[in-house]
């Protein structure tokens, strides 16, 4: 079994926040791949289904971001999972809006949700870092992540979530390259081929003159008419 965790804060007031893009990612997977209804478990909401041959549990911790590790740890212990079975979708200030990167293990880079998961299960789990951009100054970060995505962000956000859903099966079986390709195809669709120039029609040739059947005497007479 794989555990896909989407980080965010519970409640309608936070639903459209940049900080909740992890929730949005797992919700898109659930909707597009026929997962079961969301149920309250492990201090969060879970939905079960399959991605290809892999059984997958989607988890949205409802502990609020800073305590996400409590929910993740509880689910892992119940299913006897290791950090290698876990992939966490989270917002990433250090990536431009719409950019996506995979990471296995490593530090939490100051992200409070990841910090909590580190404290409960260690750092060896996988992450899908979802770029939301940076407000430009560290003092503006809290307000920035707890505000909704702007209208101008909606197109790339929709494409990113569709790409994540497209590539979810590849991600579940460990094919990170194919997952990233699926996202890239949504974010940068192939350019339409330029129409080939129409072949030139062959130029019409002037009809050949009919041979002159007049006798030499008739030709001479015609000159003096």
Swiss-Prot record:
CDD domains, per the entry: PTH
GO biological process: protein quality control for misfolded or incompletely synthesized proteins; rescue of stalled ribosome
Predominant location category: cytoplasm
Gene Ontology CC: one annotated term: cytoplasm
Regions of compositional bias (Low complexity) in chain numbering: 198-210
EC number assigned by the record: 3.1.1.29
Assembly, per entry: Monomer.
Name of the protein in question: Peptidyl-tRNA hydrolase
Species the sequence originates in: Cereibacter sphaeroides (strain KD131 / KCTC 12085)
Encoding gene, per UniProt annotation: pth
């Amino acid at each position: 079994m794989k555990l896909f965790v989407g980080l965010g804060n519970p409640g309608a007031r936070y639903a459209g926040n940049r900080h909740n893009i992890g929730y949005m990612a797992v919700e898109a997977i659930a909707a597009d791949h026929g997962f079961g209804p969301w149920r309250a478990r492990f201090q969060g909401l879970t939905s079960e289904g399959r991605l290809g041959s892999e059984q997958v549990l989607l988890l949205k911790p409802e502990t609020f971001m800073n305590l996400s590790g409590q929910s993740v740890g509880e689910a892992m212990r119940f299913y006897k999972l290791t950090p290698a079975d876990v992939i966490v979708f989270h917002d990433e200030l250090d990536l431009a809006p719409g950019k996506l990167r995979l990471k296995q293990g490593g530090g939490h880079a100051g992200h409070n949700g990841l910090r909590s998961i580190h404290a409960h299960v260690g750092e060896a789990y996988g992450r899908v870092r979802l770029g939301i951009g940076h407000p430009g100054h560290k003092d503006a970060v809290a307000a920035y992540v707890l505000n909704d995505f702007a209208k101008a962000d909606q197109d790339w956000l929709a494409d990113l979530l569709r790409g994540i859903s497209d590539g979810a099966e590849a991600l579940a079986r460990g094919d990170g390259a194919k997952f990233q390709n699926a996202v890239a195809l949504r974010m940068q669709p192939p350019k339409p081929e330029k129409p080939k120039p129409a072949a030139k029609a062959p130029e019409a040739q002037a009809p050949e003159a009919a041979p002159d059947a007049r006798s030499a005497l008739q030709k001479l007479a015609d000159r003096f008419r």
